[in-house]
A protein has these predicted regions:
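C-terminal structural segments of small proteins and small subunits
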Residues: 12, 46-74
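A structural micro-motif recognizing beta-strand termini
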Residues: 17-20
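Short alpha-helix capping/helix-loop boundary micro-motifs
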Residues: 23-28
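Structural motif
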Residues: 38-39, 59
């Protein structure tokens, strides 16, 4: 399952990044707290494919499907 698959109110731990993620994205996401073992919650999942809001370390980030689908969670 990917981060994009999380529904509003659900949470999961990051398990890994997909192999095809660009190094720049991997580095920046890790700096923001999206790293393996980190608990992440989906706080808002708007309709029509709009970016979702995720809570990581008391900070809320907006990610669209092209990025959130590269982060695998369990």
């Amino acid at each position: 399952m990917t981060l994009w698959d999380l529904t509003q109110g659900a949470s999961a731990k990051v398990s890994r990044f997909k192999a095809d993620i660009e190094n720049g994205y991997r580095t920046r996401l890790s700096e923001l707290g999206f790293h393996p073992g980190e608990q992440i919650a989906c706080v808002l999942s708007p309709r029509m494919g709009a970016p979702k809001l995720y809570l990581v370390n008391n900070t809320v980030y907006s990610l669209d499907d092209s990025i959130a689908s590269l982060i695998e969670v369990a």
